[in-house]
A protein has these predicted regions:
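Long, compositionally biased intrinsically disordered regulatory segments in eukaryotic proteins
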Residues: 1-104
């Protein structure tokens, strides 16, 4: 089974119950845990739009529920969604879009 299918299939189990459960920082530098990112690509400035979108893309694609709640901010994710969604695998994008709509 392709990796994208495995990630999409597990997405529902990995997402918090609500986007409102996302309590990540609104500013500062986030250092990703090693299980999410290879060495050298682990620091992301949350106040930099591009860095933040890269961070959120990695966490939504590879992260577990506790990673998402700790590293992703609900308000910033909603603001970034129009641009971020285009960079995600289509199955991940559709799953996240449904999840974000449900919580509005």
């Amino acid at each position: 089974m392709p990796l994208a299918d495995l990630l999409a299939g597990s997405l529902a189990r990995r997402l918090p119950a609500s986007p409102n459960d996302l309590r990540g920082p609104e500013r500062g530098v986030v250092v990703l845990p090693r299980h999410l990112c290879p060495p050298g690509l682990r620091e992301f400035d949350v106040t930099d739009d591009g860095d933040r979108r890269n961070l959120y893309g990695i966490v939504l694609t590879r992260g577990q529920r506790n990673d998402m709640t700790r590293l992703v901010n609900a308000r910033l994710l909603r603001e970034d969604w129009p641009e971020l969604s285009g960079s995600l695998d289509p199955k991940i994008r559709r799953g996240c879009a449904r999840w974000l709509k449900r919580a509005r």
